Amino acid sequence: MLLYTTNPVQQDAFIQAAVGKGYKVVKLETMVDAAFINNVEMKWEGVQFVRVDADVVDNLIDKQENVDSVLSKDEVEQAKKLFEFQIPETTITVEVKGLSQDAAPVIATRPEFMRRMKDMASMGGGGMTAFYAQMPDEVNLTINGNHAIFQALLKEPDIDKQQKQARNLADLALLSQGLLKGAELTNFINRSVDLLK
């Protein structure tokens, strides 16, 4: 398993998390690199490239380490409901995992296969890649059930404030992936200002 980055600036948080766990991340930033990745994976058995932002770092390389979430089953369900919302042209899947306490509270990732297909379509690939270009973005929102912020958020008595804070956490994660644009970005900015009042 080889971790790589296509944009070290945009993917810096994911790179830092991987390096913090002792992994190395290679830079593959050009269009030639995308073809190289596919070619190597087809020709060399057992070699797999995974973009550093394809999943939370604890899931990228399976080391059979399971960290349990400190949230109860009811709190997990409550957290999932707080993060269920719609964004145009985006399919969002929400999951709660027990990650490191110092990991981000919410992490947005895009599945490796769909991201690759969309990347190839954006480079002018025909056939099935054109089909994938028309599909909505898929985003996994991983809620870090061990982050201290959720102990306070789930106990917040003001429901409106609780929902705004949850949405801001999700929007920060989406923003880190460059997936917050247009009206959604404007709403995030306005909501952030409102929460600071």
Specify the residue positions occupied by each region the protein language model found.
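Long, intrinsically disordered, charge-dense linkers/tails
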Residues: 1-197
